[in-house]
Amino acid sequence: MSTSTQITKPYSTRALTHQSQTARRLLKLMSDKRTNLCASLDVTTSAELLSLADKLGPYICMVKTHVDIISDFTYDETVVKLVALAKKHGFMIFEDRKFADIGNTVKNQYSKGVYRIVEWADITNAHSVPGEGIINGLREAANEYVESEKAKGGECENLDRGLIMLAELSSKGSLATGSYTTKTVELAHNNSDFVFGFIAQNRMEEVQDSEGNYEDWLILTPGVGLDDKGDGLGQQYRTVDTVIKNGSDVIIVGRGLFGKGRDPVVEGKRYRDAGWKAYEERIN
């Protein structure tokens, strides 16, 4: 188990002190709703996405999307309706975009084009390969969006945006290990106003700030399964108990919730309960 100073703290306690507004919002939601389950909805039609989000909504803290695989995507029929479901059920939206280009390019990818991700995704993620410029570009887009919305004088609730860095992946043979992971943590440390966590298999080594306090990184872990070991395409599954005990804060589950022969409501409850039980055992 990780020796992290954060690992035994309740989500509600961490929500009071976290350096990121987006992370504070997520931690409070998780505590209030008693769930650390993120539903990874890798489906290819808007109808599938919205149906699953509605069925799983009561049991999750977050929906993870790959919006660019939606074959019939339109902003009004896909995004607007997904955001409405997020409000209905009380979950956040994480667009798993995995940005990986220079700062100016990712700024435009995040804010413009067909998807306009910054307008609706509370959270997105990025590779650290391009260096710090990728974080700066995404942060600029987020800040410009927030300022433009405030200038309109409309609803300003939940405008904050947060970034997660890809520190480790769950696929077999992943190159995101060792020095890559270490450098990714360094980048996050230098940009903790915007970066609040990692996609990782284990808890990241913590860094003390100038006042001697340890930074609090949220760890989101994919490749979690209660039944399967893998998928034949390199995905490797680990148990809920294992990832939570190793310091993960959010378990990301996809096909385990809605794969062939699975009832999303039944599986949503099962994974929610398993994740919460493992978390309570960790903090007690």
Swiss-Prot record:
CDD domains: OMP_decarboxylase_like (cd04725)
Keyword Lyase: yes
EC annotation from Swiss-Prot or TrEMBL: 4.1.1.23
Molecular function (Gene Ontology), one example: orotidine-5'-phosphate decarboxylase activity
GO terms for biological process, alphabetical: 'de novo' pyrimidine nucleobase biosynthetic process; 'de novo' UMP biosynthetic process
Top class in the EC scheme: lyase
Active site (UniProt): 98 (proton donor)
Substrates-to-products reaction catalysed: orotidine 5'-phosphate + H(+) = UMP + CO2
Pathway note: Pyrimidine metabolism; UMP biosynthesis via de novo pathway; UMP from orotate: step 2/2
Entry keywords, A to Z: Decarboxylase, Lyase, Pyrimidine biosynthesis
PROSITE patterns according to UniProt: OMPDECASE
Family: Belongs to the OMP decarboxylase family.
Name of this protein: Orotidine 5'-phosphate decarboxylase
Organism (species): Magnusiomyces magnusii
Gene: URA3
